[in-house]
A protein has these predicted regions:
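Macromolecular interaction modules
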Residues: 1-103
Length: 103
């Protein structure tokens, strides 16, 4: 099991949502999963929240090291396909968190 969780949250305008999900699932995630030390990615859409301003989408990446998301390999894979040009510019309210497994 991975020692770290890299959590990415973001919003996307409604008119870009279908492309966002298609490109995330068919290009972005498969590309990132080729990065050494990335074990898995699971995506979620917000169902409810008790505070305002929570991003709509969340991705959980199980990773072996906290340095992986800033690595050259991650950046190169993240920039492949349509993600960097067609989706990333339309995202907002982005958060990036890394948690270390306890125990």
């Amino acid at each position: 099991m991975a020692a770290y969780l890299y959590i990415v949250q973001m919003d996307i305008p409604a008119d870009k949502e279908a492309d966002f999900n298609r490109i995330y699932d068919t290009q972005h995630v498969p590309n990132i999963l080729t990065v050494p030390g990335v074990e898995s990615c699971t995506r979620f859409k917000l169902e409810s929240a008790d505070v305002d301003g929570i991003p709509t989408y969340l991705a959980l990446y199980a990773i072996d090291s906290p340095d992986i998301p800033q690595s050259g390999a991650w950046i190169a894979e993240s920039d492949k396909g349509d993600w960097a040009s067609q989706i990333r510019p339309h995202t907002s309210n982005r958060t990036h968190l890394i948690f270390k497994k306890v125990g």
